[in-house]
C-alpha cells in the first residue's frame, strides 16, 4: 500500500517495454520511492524506506537526526535543513532518508538515493567526495555529517536517546536529565524529572 511518485517509474517502464518489443531484454528493478515536493517555501524529500516501514518489515533499524546548514555558515543566505537517515543495526545497510528544508534538499536526497541504489553502507557516507564551494555546501556536507554520526555510533562513542525514549529514562537519580531550552520554553512545558540548564549558560570545553 505504499504511495509512490509514478512519473519516473512510468517513463523507465515505457523504455523497457519499447526495448523488449524491439527484441531487447530489459527488466524493471523496482522503485525505492524517491520523491520531492514543494510546500510553500519549504522542500520535503524522501527515498528508500522510513523507520516505520522498516520496523513493520521486521528490520532492526537505527537512525540519526541532524540539522545542518544548507551551505557554509559564514556565507550569507544559508538555511537549516533537517535530515533523518535510517539504517540497519549491525550491518549498517542504508535503508532510507527523509529531509525537510529550504534549499539543497533535492541535492542531498539524490545523493542518498544513489548511495542506496549502489548498495553503499551508512558508514560509507562519510567518505563521499562531494562538490564544495561556500555558496553551495559545506566542507563537511550534510550527507558526510550523517556518515560521521553513524561512525560515532558504530565505535560506541555516543549513545542516542529520542523523544519516544523519554518515559523509559530512569528517574531514580542515576542519570541527570537536562532540559537545555531557555527558561521561558521550560516554563511553557517540560517532561517530568528534567531540570533546566539553558544552553545559553553552557560552556563547552576547549
What are these regions (language model features)?
Residues 119-128:
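Catalytic P-loop NTP-binding/switch module of NTPases
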Residues 200-206:
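Conserved small/polar residues in nucleotide/adenosyl-binding loops
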Amino acid at each position: 500500500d505504499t504511495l509512490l511518485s509514478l512519473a519516473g517509474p512510468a517513463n523507465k517502464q515505457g523504455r523497457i517495454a519499447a526495448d523488449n518489443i524491439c527484441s531487447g531484454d530489459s527488466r524493471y528493478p523496482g522503485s525505492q520511492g524517491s520523491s520531492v515536493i514543494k510546500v510553500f517555501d519549504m522542500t520535503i524529500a524522501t527515498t528508500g524506506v522510513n523507520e516505520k516501514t522498516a520496523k513493520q518489515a521486521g528490520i532492526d533499524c537505527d537512525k540519526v537526526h541532524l540539522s545542518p546548514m544548507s551551505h557554509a555558515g559564514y556565507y550569507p543566505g544559508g538555511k537549516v535543513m533537517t535530515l533523518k537517515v535510517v539504517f540497519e543495526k549491525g550491518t549498517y545497510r542504508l535503508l532510507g532518508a527523509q529531509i525537510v528544508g529550504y534549499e539543497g534538499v533535492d541535492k542531498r536526497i539524490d545523493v542518498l538515493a544513489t548511495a542506496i541504489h549502489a548498495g553503499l553502507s551508512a558508514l560509507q557516507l562519510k567518505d563521499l567526495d562531494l562538490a564544495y564551494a561556500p555558496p553551495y555546501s559545506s566542507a563537511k556536507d550534510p550527507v558526510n555529517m550523517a556518515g560521521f554520526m553513524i561512525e560515532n555510533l558504530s565505535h560506541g562513542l555516543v549513545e542516542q536517546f529520542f523523544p519516544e525514549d523519554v518515559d523509559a529514562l530512569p528517574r531514580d537519580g542515576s542519570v541527570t536529565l537536562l532540559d537545555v531550552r531557555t527558561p521561558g520554553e521550560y516554563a511553557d512545558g517540560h517532561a517530568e524529572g528534567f531540570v533546566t540548564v539553558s544552553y545559553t549558560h553552557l560552556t563547552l570545553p576547549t
